[in-house]
Amino acid sequence: MRVNREMTELWSAALGAAGTVIRYGHWGRPVLVFPSERGRAWDFENNGMVDAIGGLIDDGRLKLYCVDSFDAASWSNHDLPLEERARRHGRYESWIVGDVVPWIYRDCNGPAEVITVGCSMGAFHAANFALKRADLIPLAMCFSGNYDPSAWHAWGERGNQAYFNNPVDYVSHLEGDHLEWLRGQLSLLLVCGQGRWEDTTGALDSTRRFAALLAAKGIKHELDLWGHDVPHDWPSWRVQLAHHMPRFC
């Protein structure tokens, strides 16, 4: 790989542990990358995603900041009720907002408009963080996501933690000044194939439904559905990322 690469560990008091962040590039717009379910910071590189946009990185148009997930202890732990999974996700949110984003700002020599990117469960994270913190993240690029955690083997009573981490729920009830602000502040790109595993993961149906919800609320978004020969897998996401990223940096 030709691009500049630096790995660091950022301690999180909320998680009680350090998480890995890998930066790729030397200059450009910061792009915060969430891995797929239970993924690690190096998954993007290992699956060819960094190379797919390596020319943009080399040219100083963007810098990638790839982070660890916390899914194994939160969303992916199906032994826990959904409310507890969402509560545990809150620790991860504290790490991202309280530790990772400030580190990105320092690395960029000041505040900068961050893009979030994610594939599969990473797409959920990219959208959820952008919708909740559009002041920090005005653009989310989401590939093959399922945006409704209540569909993830959910059980148990649901309270505020589950509600405020389910974009389908809280976007449905957005109104007033905050909705008007989001309409002028935020944009989401929703990309999904129609091939193998996009239906069984729920990604295709969820992407369509989420796009319809955003349209009903007047929130800027773009829905890009690829063909029936485009599966829910890394080769698809490499091509889709390389296709879309040049427009935003």
Annotate each language-model stretch with its function.
Residues M1-C249:
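Non-catalytic cap/lid and distal C-terminal segments of serine-dependent acyl enzymes
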